[in-house]
């Protein structure tokens, strides 16, 4: 993207001493070099750059730039940014978690901060996370008269979607992803009909829902689908998640069965399944303080430092360090508390302009 033409940035400089302003051309740089520099920056820095001048704002808002920046993050080309984030809905709060370097230089630790709710919602309403893809998070807000929104937590862009043609209480499982064939973001909500499963599919391009009847008896162990490699994944036993562009599956532990996490190193190749984590039932019994047979562990994600984040019944969020073989509590709510979590990438993708097509990648 870009041309050989020069990109001139006019910046007005001020002097407090002389109370005067002058216009000065500070830069006269080929646009290819400017674009290359900007593509290496994290989203937070790019948002600040958009305020410098109209020229930079226009460039950073350009759909081709947004797509290239996204693809660089997903494919790992942009190694200078740590764009991986975990969004947690806990009671009335939204928490953002991410890995950052420790001050003593000894690896990294999990940082936690509270983030503002989307502007279209109150702070005391029920919130359900339906999934995330390419930096967009799909949220269901409210109880009886729920609405569904697409939200970029980093840029704060929000789009309220049309009401789906189903009753929220009938929802069986759901997913959110990007269809690269049609360059369209889609939401899939499966609901239980009188004698069949109803597949309700929302197209962001069309801004409308379509309903399909599916006669097979579909049952999954987890409501939220896992989006990877252009497809949504569910599993009919134990659990499934994704991290670092790979599928992970795990089993329910028992007193006689260890808790194991397996990774599919090469997508679609069953021989590539490799066990990466094994937690003995003895360690679980000693450190989690719940009878192993009553544990309902769900792998949320695997962090860059190798720690595994897991939740138990949406009540406790714990971190397991495979090096020290120890657990620590991240969130431990009261008996009536419940939380949800989803991973996402910090990107410039807007739910508003994404409806025009493009701006997608197949993996996250």
Descriptions of predicted regions:
Residues 1-364:
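Short, conserved recognition motifs on repeat-domain binding surfaces
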């Amino acid at each position: 993207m870009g041309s050989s033409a020069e990109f001139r940035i006019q910046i007005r400089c001020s002097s407090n001493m002389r109370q005067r302003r002058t216009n000065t051309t500070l830069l006269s740089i080929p646009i290819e070099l400017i674009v290359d520099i900007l593509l290496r920056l994290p989203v937070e820095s790019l948002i600040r750059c958009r305020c410098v001048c109209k020229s930079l704002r226009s460039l950073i808002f350009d759909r081709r730039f947004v797509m290239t920046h996204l693809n660089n993050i997903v494919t790992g080309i942009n190694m200078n940014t740590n764009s991986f984030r975990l969004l947690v809905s806990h009671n009335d709060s939204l928490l953002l978690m991410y890995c950052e370097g420790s001050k003593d230089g000894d690896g990294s630790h999990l940082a936690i901060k509270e983030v503002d709710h989307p502007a279209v919602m109150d702070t005391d309403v029920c919130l359900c996370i339906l999934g995330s893809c390419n930096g967009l998070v799909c949220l269901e807000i409210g109880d009886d008269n729920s609405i569904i929104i697409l939200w970029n937590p980093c840029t704060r862009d929000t789009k309220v979607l049309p009401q789906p043609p189903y009753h929220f209480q009938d929802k069986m499982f759901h997913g959110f992803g990007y269809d690269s064939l049609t360059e369209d973001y889609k939401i899939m909500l499966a609901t239980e009909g009188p004698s069949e499963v109803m597949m309700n599919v929302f197209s962001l391009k069309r801004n409308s829902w379509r309903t399909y009847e599916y006669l097979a008896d579909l049952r999954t162990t987890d409501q939220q689908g896992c989006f990877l490699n252009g497809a949504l994944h569910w599993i009919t036993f134990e659990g499934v998640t994704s991290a670092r562009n790979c599928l992970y599956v795990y089993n329910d532990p028992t007193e006689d069965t260890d808790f194991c996490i397996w990774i599919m190193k090469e997508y679609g190749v069953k021989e590539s399944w490799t066990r990466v984590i094994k937690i003995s039932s003895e360690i679980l019994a000693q450190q989690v303080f719940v009878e192993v047979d009553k544990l309902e562990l769900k792998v949320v994600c695997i962090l860059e430092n190798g720690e595994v984040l897991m939740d138990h019944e949406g009540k406790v969020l714990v971190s397991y360090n495979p090096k020290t073989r120890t657990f620590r509590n991240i969130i431990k709510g009261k008996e009536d508390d419940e939380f949800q979590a989803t991973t996402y990438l910090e990107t410039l993708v807007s739910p508003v302009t994404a409806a025009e097509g493009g701006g997608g990648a197949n993996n996250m």
